Amino acid sequence: MITTFDKIVNDLAQLDFFSGYKFRKRDYSLFFKTESGKQFIELDHWRDRDTTSSLVIYPIYGVRFDVLHKWFEKFSVKTLQDQRDRASISFSGSMLGLQDELNFDTNGDGYSKEFENFQIILKCAEYVFSEYSSLDKLYNKTILPVLDGETGLPDVGVDWIFIDMALCKLVAPANFDKLKQIILSHVEKMYAHQEPNILDYYD
């Protein structure tokens, strides 16, 4: 039997873990709506250039809290759909110390074993969806280390700035001014290095 991306998605949907999930074709994601937003696995995929019979799937695991994105919507240069498709935080497999890409033989050879191996995505998803299941957990893992000087800030992108500030304002408003100063100082450095995304918001 020929292995296709649609077959893999259909088989995933039969697993108990994905009960209640829906598949959205425009970004190839399995997502579950929560009270505060959504949890999702985006399944980027392509044919291997060197081995045309190999289908490569690259999962991204994300959690979104709508409240962290709402205020910035009217200022963003991105389309509303693009903004609302985005996660508040996301990970690849390697960021979790696990496998990034998973391969399937499109001829169907060894499909059962490959699909069993593919279920490593459940381990990744369970971790992300549990460890980042609330604003408090997200704050403790992403904002506190910045405030304590244990980790730095991203050198690219813009969305994270407003997500982090909104998160701090909601969870720990007493720390908002401190975080704001850290972020503003970092943004000035990004601007000095002509980071393209930052330039979109400077006159």
Q: At which residue positions do the language-model features occur?
A:
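Intrinsically disordered, low-complexity regulatory regions enriched in serine/threonine/proline
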Residues: I2-F5, F32-D203
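Amphipathic alpha-helical segments
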Residues: I2-R24
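A short acidic/basic microdomain associated with nuclease active sites
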Residues: G20-G37
